[in-house]
Regions:
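Ser/Thr-rich, low-complexity intrinsically disordered terminal regions
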Residues: 1-118
Length: 118
């Protein structure tokens, strides 16, 4: 039940299609730039950035989002999100945070597919 769930993750084996890993035909820098632009538009602030681990931490008053960008090869990346929401009752907010992030990235980047290594 999503009513009390405060932790959501996207991934290759997610049971909800809206939470499956997204693959892009873009290099790491292009993907990261698009992520930061989308984050600003959705009122997130950048709390942490580690290019070595290819991770970003985004914050907003209602949640924290950890973003992992995996460089598959020089021109392909994947993006996964982990969302933690505050409060006892979340009404599935984590999923509602992840889906708009993916939708905006899909418009800015060259979307390749969902969970291709499933």
């Amino acid at each position: 039940m999503d009513l009390f769930k405060t932790h959501y993750e996207s991934g290759e084996r997610a049971t909800d299609e809206g939470l499956l890993t997204h693959y892009y035909k873009n290099n790491y820098q292009q993907t990261k730039t698009a992520l930061l632009e989308v984050a600003r538009e959705l009122e997130f602030t950048l709390a942490f950035e580690d290019d070595t681990r290819q991770e970003l931490m985004l914050k907003r008053k209602d949640c924290e989002v950890s973003v992992t960008v995996v460089k598959i090869n020089p021109i392909e990346t994947t993006v996964d999100f982990t969302v933690n929401t505050s409060g006892i009752i979340s009404f599935g907010k984590g999923k509602k945070v992840i889906q708009p992030l993916y939708q905006a990235l899909d418009k800015r980047l060259m979307f390749k597919g969902l969970a291709l290594n499933r």
